[in-house]
Amino acid sequence: MFSKKIPHTLESDSDITSPLDLWYQERHNDEVSFGLHVKKVLHSVQSPFQRVDVFESTGFGRILTLDGLMMCSDRDEFVYHEMISHVPLLVHPNPKRVLVIGGGDGGTLREVLRHDCVQEAVLCEIDGEVVEAAKQFFPSLAFGLNHPRAKVHIGDGVDFVKKSAAAQFDIIIVDSTDPIGPGVGLFSGEFYKEVKRILTPGGIVMAQCESPWENKFDLAKVYGNLKEAFSSVYSMVGTIPSYPYGYWSWGFASDDVHPFESINFEKARAIEKGTKYYNVDIHKSAFALPNFLKQKLHGVVKNA
């Protein structure tokens, strides 16, 4: 995760390492990595599930990493959180109860609570250390964690869904980590079938589905697991510079709702006055996929 040794050429065959040269590095694979210059380590704790770190970086502000993997940064977190939240909320006819699985940083919850129609937003995060780190170091993300319309449950998302009564959430947002470690169970077909069980009729699931450029995960399988539970699955894409390859995808799944044909334009125009990335044009164009991704997801998602 860290690279402290930055060569400085003094003579033809000598170098030194400055104690001020601290870099965060996320290796995507054996050929590609992403790095940020770190000014200060603000927080580091080993929870029962993962290592939770907060750094102050030079170019991206504060960053939150879990087991060395980038979760969010001050500079571009709004892209992820706005898209995963506003797209489903602005096409559902009457979203009153929303469940966020994962998302302990609070960013998705923050965006959900922009919608006055949401009477209750429940967040289920497996790791309380993530929530505490967000409250301490990311106040602009975490203010929703103490909102009167929000309920925060610390526990396993898979268990929470299994123990929940049927047909009680209008929208479920799966704001998970990668399909490894604590997040692996949140990508299975069995999990999505349980998620569907606790959705109200006409409900929507929105799930993060990894980078289209990443080859270590079978993207067709990731979306195919959603398709095991829902008749209509769409892929949505967006640019997030701090995430692997700078290009991300989400899955929109429902049996009844189209991802952009029923946008509530009045609400969308009001919402986009306070967003940095989301607008109606972006909403619609995010479902236009490049050919290489259409080929990967042909026969799996509706827009491929």
Feature locations, PLM:
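A general beta-strand register signal
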Residues: 65-66
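Conserved Class I S-adenosyl-L-methionine
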Residues: 192-193, 218-240, 251
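N-terminal glycine-rich anion-binding loops that anchor highly charged ligand groups
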Residues: 52-62
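SAM/dcSAM-binding transferase cores
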Residues: 2-53, 224, 245-304
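The AdoMet/dcAdoMet-binding core of the Class I SAM-like
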Residues: 4-23, 47, 72-204, 213-223, ...
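Structural detector of well-ordered beta-strand residues that form the stable sheet scaffold
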Residues: 205-206, 234
